[in-house]
């Protein structure tokens, strides 16, 4: 469960290392974001010469959460960290590589480019 002021790791090579959630998109008063949700975030830590800079406001999709996700078959899936992938205006990833596993719920949210770049889909 991601909400405002939650800090997330960045799971791509866009240049950002850590982002902070500003707003959860979807609905008028949506409070929490889960895997597959799009958020608006501020870049808190970035590497020099990256595609995104520190302080920049970006959109990102959540790909991993520490809070477990219950699937329809009854299984629970949880990860070691909260992570997101930064998106551009067309909802494609800014980076060209994805690091770490990605949850299958990202596929259900129609982010196929992220699924194809991910090394592992859990």
UniProtKB/Swiss-Prot annotation:
Keyword RNA-binding among record annotations: yes
Subunit architecture: Part of the 50S ribosomal subunit. Forms a cluster with proteins L3 and L19. In the 70S ribosome, L14 and L19 interact and together make contacts with the 16S rRNA in bridges B5 and B8.
Family classification: Belongs to the universal ribosomal protein uL14 family.
The protein, known as: Large ribosomal subunit protein uL14
Top-level taxon: Bacteria
InterPro entries: Ribosomal_uL14, Ribosomal_uL14_bac-type, Ribosomal_uL14_CS, Ribosomal_uL14_sf
GO BP terms: translation
PANTHER family, sorted: 50S/60S RIBOSOMAL PROTEIN L14/L23, LARGE RIBOSOMAL SUBUNIT PROTEIN UL14M
SUPFAM superfamilies: Ribosomal protein L14 (SSF50193)
């Amino acid at each position: 469960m991601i909400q405002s002021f939650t800090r997330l790791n960045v799971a791509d090579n866009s240049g950002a290392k850590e982002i902070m959630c500003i707003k959860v998109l979807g609905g008028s008063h949506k409070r929490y974001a889960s895997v597959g949700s799009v958020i608006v975030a501020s870049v808190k830590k970035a590497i020099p010469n990256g595609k995104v800079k520190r302080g920049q406001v970006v959109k990102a999709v959540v790909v991993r959460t520490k809070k477990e996700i219950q699937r329809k078959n009854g299984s629970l899936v949880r990860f070691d960290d909260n992570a997101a992938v930064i998106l551009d205006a067309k909802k494609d990833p800014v980076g060209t590589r994805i690091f770490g596993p990605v949850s299958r719920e990202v596929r259900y949210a129609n982010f196929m480019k992220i699924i194809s770049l991910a090394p592992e889909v859990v």
